[in-house]
Amino acid sequence: MRDSDTDIILYISLLGVCPVIGLCGIIANIINIIIFIRNGFTESINVSLFGLAISDLLALLFLVPFAAFINPYSLYSEDLNWNAMDFALILVAFPNSTFNRTTCLITVFITVERCLCFVMPLRVKSLITPRRSAIIVAAIFALMTFNLVLAYVAMQLDWRLDPGRNKTMIGTVLTRHDSSELLNIRNIISLCSQLFSLLALVVSNIALAVAVKKQAKWRARIVITAPQQNQTAASNRTADSTTYRNRRLARMIQFLSLILFVTYFFSSVIYLISQFVREFNFYGRYKNEYRSFWMVALAAQGLNSSVNIVFYYRMNIKYRNRFNKMFRKGIARIGIFPADHNTMENTIVALSHRDTVR
């Protein structure tokens, strides 16, 4: 791939697509964080989604500044005494990739948690408490932060000879005799965590789909035999409401998992190729291909971190109600305020109220 082709991809991705996606995603995730805080952390799923929003926000905060380093002036100006690619790698690329993988692992945990809600509905609340969810999410952040620290221990910015410009510039240098080993450990952790995340997402979502289907069949049998078991209509409606809410939340998690799998599959392939092709890296023989592929992967990962708000609003009743309260005037002004979502829960509540009046 020619240098000019690589530059076109870099500019489109980092000067056009990524800043727009990043800024929209930052606003969306700030809204997510505020809503989850206001809804409280009495449920473990809120704790997990709050951690996911923080991870997405941090990833996007390091995505937007790419444009400050990767632009025509910083890449080709002879007046600068620092290497733009090296600065981008150290200051934004490493943190961005760290929080992207954090997002992957937290999404896996959320999916497994939802799966357990269907497989072990009576035990899941005692098994996965809000406190335990917070500990697991914090442990994921700690593991990925350790992975980031390895990179900063092995590399730093300092004066070095830049062969491309034949001058001394500030760029990345290895700081220790074992820096190569530390970077290899970091790469292995990064690769394993991402491959594990994708594999776990596939397995857990298949299990979740099977569990949802089994619960639906079980509920259908209960409804048929309810009169024989002297179950009241009110208890049936309560069970229907709970079942519907769980299924709706499961669908939301499945959509989030699908988007994450699609957007992160590309970067996982890049990691695999780089492990088997020595020159396929940031500075090797195939650096243009490597950098171009990563720019596309960055845009895809940024999109994944930005679209969650849409699924939360469409599929989470508590989130939607809180969102509507926060932005009621603005939503009403543009005519999209959902006065009645025609959800099953609204119908059940109305029927229950009617029976109570009777």
Locate predicted features.
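Loop architecture of class A 7-transmembrane GPCRs
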Residues: M1-D3, Y73-T98, S126, N147-F196
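Extracellular TM2-ECL1-early TM3 structural module of rhodopsin-like
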Residues: D7-V20, I45-F109, C117
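First transmembrane helix
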Residues: L10-R38, L199-V203
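Helix-to-loop junction signature of class
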Residues: C18, G22, L58-E78, N96, ...
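Intracellular effector-coupling site of seven-transmembrane GPCRs
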Residues: I54-S55, I170-H177, V210-S267
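Fourth transmembrane helix
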Residues: L58-F62, F69-P72, F99-F109, L116, ...
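Seventh transmembrane helix
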Residues: A200-L201, R251, F255-V262, S268-L272, ...
